UniProtKB/Swiss-Prot annotation:
This is Serine/threonine transporter SstT. One of its GO terms (molecular function) is neutral L-amino acid:sodium symporter activity. The keyword Magnesium does not apply. Keywords: Amino-acid transport, Cell inner membrane, Cell membrane, Membrane, Symport, Transmembrane, Transmembrane helix, Transport. Its main location: membrane. Belongs to the dicarboxylate/amino acid:cation symporter (DAACS) (TC 2.A.23) family. The chain crosses the membrane at residues 11-31, 43-63, 82-102, 141-161, 192-212, 216-236, 290-310, 316-336, 363-383. Involved in the import of serine and threonine into the cell, with the concomitant import of sodium (symport system). It comes from Shewanella sp. (strain ANA-3). GO terms for biological process: serine transport; threonine transport.
Length: 408
């Protein structure tokens, strides 16, 4: 019995990244050995993602309300520089995608459109959807995972409780701590969940269908790699004036890997919160910036919208001048910030960007269908970039504020 508990303790305290790596290798091996067996363990991945998605809304709501209610007067939360970083990073991602798309123009083999999808008719509709999400019923927001609404009600409750008695504030702090403990437990199950996700993905797709879109994927993933490994570190260096790579690599390893396999920014919120706690960041800051980042920090989405739109334009023989490309960068960045307000995310915002070049909705929906074909890799890489960048920019802004305070 003692030996069993010792083994469990070793597993619980061992390197999570190493355990996830073992899970990935085991998942690929099982799918290679037996497709049927791999499909049988798919439920492990679904359970893991389901658990993260279930706890994320209540975690965000309680953590935001608790941190604002318990916030000391004159406490600096650094939210303005973080939001600026989010918006600048998203625009830089769109611009990078434009440059790469023009250097390596891609032709698409267009397929049938996606049935039953309804893309937004314009940027106004995207903003309108986001505004209505802001005033959603709080219970409905928690049930449906509407993080714009959850943030709004969490901030409102926190401000209302700011002048409450210390015992009331302590209750919220204790509940927040309890939920954080539950999150840590769920995150320790990541190797098992990722094993199920990897096995199911390889068994169901085998990535054969994706091979025909190798050049398109190379441009997409190349743009995302440039943002993750060159542009983001450069932005962080400007903020903190030291080598940014230890922070960037740690965030990619501890946040990006999990996000890659869960393919859900919402499911990765608890992982990012736990990482911010490990980095000893200010709770008042990250409890708001991380869920906000999952909503508006969409560099990966901006890349997807831009690359697929320019690929469609090139396929149809449409010449794109520099000014139009710049305008596309702005539209893609704004649209990407609203991706969380659209069912289907970044892919269903492609028709909006295609309308800049007079591309018909029928053709645009065929481009969306191409996006769904490569979605296994595109969506995973996009989520990994988006989610890890939330922590990178939050940490950079917090450290920059600390350095400024030390200098007086």
């Amino acid at each position: 019995m003692k030996q069993e508990s010792s083994l469990l303790a070793k597993l619980a305290n061992g390197s999570l990244v190493l355990q996830i790596l073992v899970g990935i290798i085991a998942g690929v091996s099982l799918a290679s050995f037996s497709h049927e067996a791999a499909k049988q363990v798919a439920f492990l991945g679904s359970l893991f993602v389901g658990a993260l998605k279930a706890i994320a809304p209540i975690l965000v709501f309680i953590l935001v309300a608790s941190s604002i209610a318990n916030q000391k007067k004159n406490t600096q939360t650094n939210m303005r520089p973080i939001v600026v970083l989010y918006l600048f990073g998203t625009f830089a991602a769109a611009l990078t995608a434009v440059v790469l798309s023009m250097m390596f123009p891609t032709n698409l083999v267009l397929v049938a459109g996606v049935e039953g999808t309804s893309p937004p008719q314009g940027i106004g509709e995207v903003i309108n959807t986001l505004l209505f999400k802001l005033v959603d019923n709080p219970v409905n927001a928690l049930m449906t995972g509407n993080y714009i609404g959850i943030l709004a009600w969490g901030v409102g409750l926190g401000l209302a409780l700011h002048h409450a008695s210390d015992s009331t504030k302590q209750v919220f702090a204790d509940v927040s701590h309890g939920i954080s403990q539950m999150v840590r437990f769920i995150i320790r199950l990541a190797p098992i969940g990722i094993f199920g996700l990897v096995a199911a993905t390889f068994a169901e797709t085998g990535f054969a269908a994706i091979a025909g879109y190798a050049k398109l994927l190379a441009v997409l993933l190349g743009a995302m790699a440039i943002i993750a490994l060159i542009v983001n570190p450069l932005i962080v260096y400007v903020k903190i004036k030291r080598n940014p790579y230890p922070l960037v690599i740690r965030c990619l390893r501890e946040s990006g890997v999990t996000a890659f396999f869960t393919r859900s920014s919402a499911a990765n919120i608890p992982v990012n919160m736990a990482l911010c706690e490990k980095l000893k960041l200010h709770e008042d800051t990250y409890s708001v910036s991380i869920p906000l980042g999952a909503t508006i920090n969409m560099g990966g989405a901006a890349i997807t919208i831009t690359v697929l739109t320019l690929a469609a334009a090139h396929t149809l023989g449409i010449q794109v001048d520099l000014l139009t490309a710049l305008l596309l960068s702005v539209v893609a960045a704004i649209s990407a910030c609203g991706a969380s307000g659209v069912a289907g995310g970044s892919l269903l915002l492609i028709p909006l960007a295609c309308s800049l070049f007079g591309i018909s909705n029928d053709v645009a929906m065929q481009v969306v269908a191409v996006g769904f074909i490569i979605g296994v890799i595109q969506d995973a890489a996009e989520t990994a970039l988006n989610s890890s960048t939330d922590v990178i920019f939050t940490a950079a802004a917090c450290e920059a504020a600390e350095n400024k305070a030390k200098l007086g």
